[in-house]
């Protein structure tokens, strides 16, 4: 049973990933576990994946790729800088960073930048201006007091870094994700459709159905969002790097536009970064953080993500529980008239979209308390999620993987039920389950979308009273699937 309709992604470190910890997060409202490939070993991944699967087959796993990012190299100890200091920057991944010379992982870094350009290191904590340039290095002036640690992020607002979309490490991690049957790959710094297709090519070559989430982290990704959505399976609004690459005052507007475009495309969208940042060290959020979460839900996001709050923070379970409470209240408070209106799209023959829209509309006209769909690919459930009904969607899935792929879709409770003969059996099993849990009464009405046959497109919508539907089930001598109650 869903504690709220908005889904929660929680980042988990291999240093804190025991079964009991993951179970606590799951029971607090977590739907998806995020693994960051930049901060874990292969052995750590093995333990994390095994422990997630031990807790529940309903928890989806999302793996981050590094993408075309630039980082400083390692340094022996933290380096303090003062405003006005001068420092050289070179593009040499094999060179250790020192106080006099910061080395970065991108070899062509010097040639890509010009005098007057700004360089932001460690999410903008250290700001540098290029004041001179040679063939070998950039001479920069430090613009603020800061301390530089090892392997920190490097951003250059307004400059296109000509790195390939995938590193060799990314390719190896994608192959590992395929081997371990991971559910989602979140690709960092997606700039255009080709960045997504580069991953799709690898997945297709291995007959993998892993879903690709495009992380929008720079202006180029924002500008190309329409073409990205044509080929990606979902989007993450990664506000950390995005807030460095573009003026931070533009982030709320960009967030709203990206959410709207994802809903119109009927693809899940995640809002990420600093949602409950103060809960890394404090047991309670700020009022601004509470409002930030609520506003993301009012904008109609599918999911919210926690990063450091759950990866290494002092109050990880409390952070998930807090986000769950805020989400549940915001869902009650949001106004239906502010919902993003979803047109059927250019393809007026899209029967699935038409029926999904009618089912959701019916919940506001009739006393429908749930919408049920049997789901082979998850497409019908994602259509229902896009139309944002006020009652939950119960998706009865033919495959475990489909169930987990729906872990990012708003308001969808996905359940795996194998070995049933047809969609009607799934429907009746779902009704009995909801009755037993007290979530439906015999006199309630439900909507049911199905094709009647696994693997074919949704072709009909039924609206029934629960007790009448179950009476029909008994008359047709369909089995009472108590094993799924």
Task: List the predicted regions and their residue ranges.
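Non-catalytic helical/linker scaffolds that mediate oligomerization, partner binding
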Residues: 1-485
